[in-house]
Amino acid sequence: MTPSRLAFTACSPEPELHLFEAEPTSTKIVFAELELDAYWDYEVEVGVRYEWRTEWYYGWDAEDYRIWGEIGYVIPNTFNIRRYFTGSTPYAHHTKVISNTIEGNTFQGEFNYGFWDMLVFNDIKLKDGVQSLNFDETTTLDSITVYTNQSMAKARYNAPRYSHAFYEPEELFSAYEQAIEIDREHKGFEYDPERNLWVKRLNMVLQPITYIYLTQVIVHHNNGKIVGVEGTGTLSGFARSSVLNSGRGGEDPVSVTYQTRWKKDCDMNGEKVDIAGGRLLNFGLCGHACGRLHSKQEVHDTEKHYMDVKLLFNNGIDSTFVFDVTQQVRDRYKGGVLTVELDMDTISVPSRSGGSGFDAVVKEFEEETHEIEM
């Protein structure tokens, strides 16, 4: 996705700035030019942009919107601001925080002369009234760590420290600027004669902290063998947490649980196929600030990424299929479409619950499920 910019404008009346060390006065901060690309926009190869629409066959209808909301990112309009005054020393440790929340694009606050650090992140809009994101602002004032907790869903793969999969986070974006100087000589300010104000502009890049993945298991030649999905899936090997200031994902790999839905007779280049589709958010790759990367050559991911989906067959038996999507995830390091395809002419209907019944697997992953390398 294309980075969005938060243009802060610090305003004060002419001829004096009216900021005092002992008695700070109000200064207006204005957000401008806030635009957020709805989908992914980055290079998958040198000079090659990612075209997700050419890969996505599941579609997006009214029921999908009811379950997940928009298919892509939604522009936030409410922001949390954390301001840290570091006195005469830029890039110093934070000893105190000033917190504010704003609606719209204007903030009225007070600033002392000296250096400031500023962190901005969107307020969370909930569909069901339950927030998954947790914000740790007390362990250290130098950064804010965000994370989710474990769900009731089992984590079967590549989550060595945790027995359960984690809830997916909500959409989250942040921008962080350090060593913002408020100077009594107006250094770094510009004068606006129309408004009779001194203006200091801070172009802060709004980057995603959570990343959207669209998953689709495309079933060819189904002929009624698979009749639906259990309704949930998991995707493994992603960061458990992230740091708002840097955008860097934590080092602990976890599985993330998400909803899935079954659709019949989807069009795939003229062929009618059935698809188990889903949408999930996560904190990206462990140890990476994915939103700040520019090419997949910068990705040094060492985790394996498995996607599992429980499919329901026409004889009443369910079967969990596990797909190795590691390379797809590394290629789509900022999110995107993950696709696997099954040809039901080569897959037998299972005779016992839990078993995939897939007789063309690379290797058996565990007794009830199989790993399928794509």
Regions found by a protein language model. Name each.
Residues C11-I144, R330-M374:
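Acidic/polar, low-complexity intrinsically disordered N-terminal segments immediately downstream
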Residues R66-Q131, I226-R330:
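Tryptophan-paired
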Residues M1-S12:
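Sec-dependent bacterial lipoprotein signal peptides
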Residues E35-D41, D123-K125, I218-N222, L312-I317:
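Short, flexible beta-strand-to-coil junctions
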Residues G87-Q207:
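Short, low-hydrophobicity acidic/polar segments
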Residues Y167, E171-M268:
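A sequence/structural signal for flexible, mid-protein segments enriched
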Residues F31, D117-L119, R201-N203, L214-Q216, ...:
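Beta-strand secondary-structure signal
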